Amino acid sequence: SPKPEWVEGLNRMDMNIVPSTFTKNVFQNCVYDRMDENTKQKVGELRMTKPMEVLFEGADLNIYKKTKEFSKELVDEMEKIPEKFTFLYTGHWLQGDLGQDRKDTGMLLKVFLETFKNKKNPPALIMKTSGATFSVIDRNEIMNKIQDIKKTVTGNLPNIYFLHGDLLDEEMNEMYNHPKVKAHITFTHGEGFGRPLLEATLSEKPVLASAWSGHVDFLHQDKAILL
């Protein structure tokens, strides 16, 4: 839920703009009791009183679209992956212990490993992720997180492919569309919008995502698997 100071900040604005109807509803439905510091009795309520409008971010349809054209660099890299079925995760790995980071990246990795361990011909997971930067230090920290989670799962584990660094929009669209990428997946539970999920849908491949957050504005049960 939004913090009380966030609601107070919104009420200092003439107009508030958010990227999704989901986000707008969260703020509109958020109500806090105002308590008297001495009597500890309720003396009122804190809620958003200023206008809020939704500005849908959208995606560039000239870039994000279904395609069968791929750069030689991507083709060469993807040939190094023996699996013909991979899930793609695109998103930051934010602060917080397992199950507590906003995008739930660590839990996605753990559940994937637990689900497909000891399976014959398991799928792989491609993780296009980073922390705060694209530095070598950040890359090493993410690699350590992956290894730490792998140590908690016993058995013959499926492969994890870690992709770190900034890609052009056109390169990301090629990733979404590559034939080895069969579906896009995320456990996120804190999206204001969820741009990578929208971009991924434009490849016309399945998207598996949580049924809570800004992306429910454009991900529907008939075109996505909402967990």
Could you describe each region identified by the protein language model?
Residues 174-192, 202-206:
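Acidic donor-binding loop of glycosyltransferase active sites
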Residues 1-5:
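A short, histidine- and acid-enriched strand-loop-helix "catalytic/donor-clamping" loop
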Residues 194-197, 212:
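Short glycine/serine-rich donor-binding loops of glycosyltransferases
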Residues 15-73:
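Donor nucleotide-sugar binding/catalytic pocket of nucleotide-sugar-dependent glycosyltransferases
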Residues 61-174:
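Conserved catalytic-core segment of nucleotide-activated headgroup transferases in glycan assembly
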Residues 99, 187-194, 216-217, 227:
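Nucleotide-sugar-dependent
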Residues 206-209, 225-226:
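Short hydrophobic beta-strand element within catalytic cores of glycosyltransferases
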Residues 7-14:
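A conserved, positively charged/aromatic
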